[in-house]
């Protein structure tokens, strides 16, 4: 699961419950170098659909999955 994203340096990043790496955000993927979307709880404890796959959008939709 992910917390709602916070602002860091103008970009939104969401920290996972386990606190390891970024959960959401452009170019950051759940501690696995992805885009921060689509990784399940088996990959660091983050939920699916943690953020939208748009690096330029303002809607990361980091919530509780």
Swiss-Prot record:
One Pfam family here: KRTAP
Signal peptide: none
Claim: Ligase is one of the keywords in the record: no
GO cellular component, one term: cytosol
Keyword Repeat: yes
Highest rank taxon of the organism: Eukaryota
InterPro entries given in the database record: KRTAP_matrix (IPR052878), KRTAP_type8/19/20/21/22 (IPR021743)
Keywords, ordered alphabetically: Keratin, Repeat
Disulfide bonds: none
Described purpose of this protein according to its UniProt entry: In the hair cortex, hair keratin intermediate filaments are embedded in an interfilamentous matrix, consisting of hair keratin-associated proteins (KRTAP), which are essential for the formation of a rigid and resistant hair shaft through their extensive disulfide bond cross-linking with abundant cysteine residues of hair keratins. The matrix proteins include the high-sulfur and high-glycine-tyrosine keratins.
Entry similarity comment: Belongs to the KRTAP type 20 family.
Subunit annotation: Interacts with hair keratins.
Record-given protein name: Keratin-associated protein 20-2
Species of origin: Homo sapiens (Human)
């Amino acid at each position: 699961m992910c917390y709602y994203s916070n602002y860091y340096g103008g970009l939104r990043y969401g920290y996972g419950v386990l606190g390891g790496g970024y959960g959401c955000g452009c170019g950051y993927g759940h501690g696995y170098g992805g885009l921060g979307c689509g990784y399940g709880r088996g990959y660091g404890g983050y939920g699916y659909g943690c953020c939208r796959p748009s690096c330029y959008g303002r809607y990361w939709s980091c919530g509780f999955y």
